[in-house]
Amino acid sequence: MTEIFSSLYGQPDSQGPAGPSALGFGSGKPQVPQNMGPMCFPHQMMEEGAPVRKPAAMNEPFYLLRELPMENELTGHTNLITHYNLEHAYNKFCGKKVKEKLSNFLPELPGMIDSPGIQDNSSLRSLIEKPPVCNNSFSPLTGAMLTGFRLHTGPLPEQYRLMHIQPPKKKNKHKHKHHRPQDPLPPETPSDSDHKKKKKKKDDDPDRKKKKKDKKKKKNRHSPDHPGMTGAQPSTSSLR
């Protein structure tokens, strides 16, 4: 490979193998040997007398152009409600009157929040439209001026008395669930009814109860824990 390259460009073999930059694969460019004349390309050959294009023109920069992107209709300036024809839905949901007051949703906020702020001049719009007139410099408050900020015991105004009282909760009546009718009981057979009647008769028989009591008494007399048996033992031992 080196012999072929040296024969083409007239370089001796002592320079070593050509690197990638010499072959045109790297960042560098192959050096044109001085012995060889200017290279002519087929498309550069023209008639005699016409100016020949220089080979250096091939190394000039060039630009690639493409079509510009289409303009997007949706921008930050467009109104999406009118773009998607949602004006009717917007007016339907935003113009709906709410039955419940604002205090029901925000019970912990102090003050009368149900009434508009225009009545007592506490709205933020009033600060924007009519800002308070004040000096540029701030001066500390004196002791006489601080007396107006002291808290004094006294009755609360009527509008603040019911501030901490929560409205009574509505009692929801429990709905009684209607039970489904159970399956009808099977009719009693005559054998079952006779057996139940016999049990009732046995329980209600007074003679039977007396017999049970007598049996219990006899068992208690013959048992060693009976007090009569313990008292009879020393008498028998004394007779012996």
From Swiss-Prot:
InterPro entries: Mediator_Med19_met. Pfam families: Med19 (PF10278). It is found in: Nucleus. Residues 1-14 have a biased composition (Polar residues). Residues 1-29, 168-240 are annotated as: Disordered. Its main location: nucleus. The keyword Nucleus applies. Residues 168-180, 209-221 have a biased composition (Basic residues). GO terms for cellular component: mediator complex. Keywords: Activator, Nucleus, Transcription, Transcription regulation. One of its GO terms (molecular function) is transcription coregulator activity. Coiled coil: none annotated. GO terms for biological process: positive regulation of transcription by RNA polymerase II. Component of the Mediator complex. Component of the Mediator complex, a coactivator involved in the regulated transcription of nearly all RNA polymerase II-dependent genes. Mediator functions as a bridge to convey information from gene-specific regulatory proteins to the basal RNA polymerase II transcription machinery. Mediator is recruited to promoters by direct interactions with regulatory proteins and serves as a scaffold for the assembly of a functional preinitiation complex with RNA polymerase II and the general transcription factors. Belongs to the Mediator complex subunit 19 family. PANTHER family: LUNG CANCER METASTASIS-RELATED LCMR1 PROTEIN, MEDIATOR OF RNA POLYMERASE II TRANSCRIPTION SUBUNIT 19. This is Mediator of RNA polymerase II transcription subunit 19-B. It comes from Danio rerio. The gene is med19b.
